[in-house]
Amino acid sequence: MITDPGPAPPAAAGDPAAAAAAVHVSGLRKHYGDVVALAGVDLAIGAGEFFTLLGPSGSGKTTLLRLIAGFERPDAGRIELGGGDVTRTPPYARNVNTVFQDYALFPHMTVGQNIEYGLRVRRVPKAERREKVDRALEMVRLPGLGNRKPAQLSGGQRQRVALARAIVNEPQVLLLDEPLGALDLKLRQEMQLELLRVQREVGITFIYVTHDQEEALTMSDRIAVLNHGSIEQIGGPVEVYEWPRTPFVAGFIGVSNLIERDGHTITVRPEKLALIKDGEPEPPDAHVEPGQVRDVIYAGVLTRYVVDLDAGGELVVSRQNAEPASVATGSRVRVSWRPGQAFTIPQGPDQGSRAGEGKQ
């Protein structure tokens, strides 16, 4: 039976039911003319949680972040920070800070002056400011660079300064709007680990906006997957990847195979599949789909095989390149998976048509 759902998904990490909620939004709606940016969002984020808003362009993730920051007002709904209603509170009166993709550093100021700017506005004594700035520079691993100008730093260093400027104010919540988007791949991967380390050290609630699934899976305690102004699923990285609740989530998070069988939508990840050549034995208790290899795609550490199935549909199979590929285009093969590796996805009124959106 190919619809075996396997084991139940684990409980989401950082569930605010087990911790005080730092941020709570209910019934949040926002329109721009005829465009519905948010369609009644309900969300609770635990104190000290690294929470990611993940979705494609136009999904509403940045709008939600801007509403929490106070840069815009909702058309309906309520926003609470630490249990207090801040729905109509201006940005400067909210205990939050925001880190943007473009850093937003003052070019005429030194690194140290940029970091201490918020402290000066709050009239923190000079000696305390210096101590906090030095501590923040140590935290982001830029000790001794306080006298440099932003133009003398690399992109990664400037992003660290922007982070230090935000955390030095000790906000209740730190909002990060795709802060790594302007960095190259290697530096972006390094900064993912740095952000996670800093968040764990300071214990501040991070709300992180991105369209990058790898970033979300790498750093987050929990992830909210947004689409067309609504939340499709909230859960830990393992849960949203291994147990997607909608076709959209299955298609947007990584690569997922979706096939129709017996009136059900079946999903199975490419890395869960085995490719069996003619003459090779089939694994016991496995479900098997015969077909023909249409494409063989070399991708460095792995090779992807696109198989047209005799029963209809296609499956993408990923195999690690531990040894040379031995299956060629046009080969007859059987694709197999074990019970629990494939499961059905409930169909909503408009989900089926979106099953393939966002594949990467």
PLM features per residue range, with description:
Residues 2-6, 256, 265-360:
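Non-catalytic connector elements of ABC transporters
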Residues 50, 89-245:
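ABC ATPase nucleotide-binding domains
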Residues 54-56:
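The feature captures the beta-strand-to-loop junction immediately N-terminal to the Walker
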Residues 77-85:
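Conserved ABC transporter NBD signature motif
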